[in-house]
Amino acid sequence: MCDVVLGSQWGDEGKGKLVDLLCDDIDVCARCQGGNNAGHTIVVGKVKYDFHMLPSGLVNPKCQNLVGSGVVIHVPSFFAELENLEAKGLDCRDRLFVSSRAHLVFDFHQRTDKLKEAELSTNKKSIGTTGKGIGPTYSTKASRSGIRVHHLVNPDPEAWEDFKTRYMRLVESRQKRYGEFEYDPKEELARFEKYREALRPFVVDSVNFMHEAIAANKKILVEGANALMLDIDFGTYPYVTSSSTGIGGVLTGLGIPPRTIRNVYGVVKAYTTRVGEGPFPTEQLNKVGETLQDVGAEYGVTTGRKRRCGWLDLVVLKYSNSINGYTSLNITKLDVLDKFKEIEVGVAYKLNGKELPSFPEDLIDLAKVEVVYKKFPGWEQDITGIKKYDDLPENAKNYLKFIEDYLQVPIQWVGTGPARDSMLEKKI
């Protein structure tokens, strides 16, 4: 059976820390979607490991790790990340596998990603992408012109000729769209001829890989990237990523049926953050937002960009839960709220004076909503490193209890500090 870790807000909730905790007792860790446009750090002992595309289960020497079909792979970044982990002493090559059906991200995808973003920014319609080529790659995938891993690693000489033809067709279409941008396709092709041999040992039929693991009753952890509110279908479109970041992406990205899912863990930051453009109803463009940003060290791992900050939004979380069906929650960074005398939580939206029954899909409406807040007294004491739920201040427990009651989902873990072991588990 599979347990799944998913982001419930706009990303950066701290999924990696929960995955790190759960990785100690699993046999397989799988990434199902996204690319190297996300990132987190795992600390083992005194060593920090940075993950962007590769599964976090690599830190467990007994765990096999899969980059699934729904992931898009920038091969140079794949090897750079792997080599960085190995340089820090992690022996993981024999435990890392890549789906033959995953699509490839090329340098021209990254180049066109930045050109498109610059084009949009002139009209003040920038999405705020990471520039990693993720969107353009999913675009070629959807238009059925993309190139998959098996196209690259197939040892048949005809396959390499087919790869080059597909590649040049994609390059030429981008040149027609954007002109003669600074790019050397011959140089990239020469690199990929070498990657063809280097990547081949990692490649597997991921559907067969997953179903063999399930049949063998292996403990499987699926590591979601990004978060529900960035989902291509259910997020704040068009200010979203280009993949299915919810529970649906787990199934389609790994080729597994719904009945194989056991637990869905929703990771919830104790307040709300967002990177890049897009609506953010509870954003605090004031001292509150600045304090959350400073105390919470809210800067992106992948881009280094400052994260926008605001109060917890339970309207967003209720919507997120309705789609992903969380079996329990991990509330992260509760300690960031330690010094607030008063804490607010968004509990409803009003539009034109009327309370909305659900999260609005139209951004014009979303930009006009009035957030209804509930106020809580803060606990104004340091909770860093607390290991038992009962040892939390009463006001902190009241805050958490309200979240549970509102969402009707139990809280199983609470983050009480940045350290690896600053996570308490609550009986549910």
UniProtKB/Swiss-Prot annotation:
Pathway: Purine metabolism; AMP biosynthesis via de novo pathway; AMP from IMP: step 1/2. GTP binds at residues 11-17, 39-41, 307, 333-335, 415-417. It is found in: Cytoplasm. One of its GO terms (biological process) is 'de novo' AMP biosynthetic process. Keywords: Cytoplasm, GTP-binding, Ligase, Magnesium, Metal-binding, Nucleotide-binding, Purine biosynthesis. Gene3D superfamilies: Adenylosuccinate Synthetase, subunit A, domain 1, Adenylosuccinate Synthetase, subunit A, domain 2, Adenylosuccinate Synthetase, subunit A, domain 3. Disulfide bonds: none annotated. Plays an important role in the de novo pathway and in the salvage pathway of purine nucleotide biosynthesis. Catalyzes the first committed step in the biosynthesis of AMP from IMP. Belongs to the adenylosuccinate synthetase family. This is Adenylosuccinate synthetase.
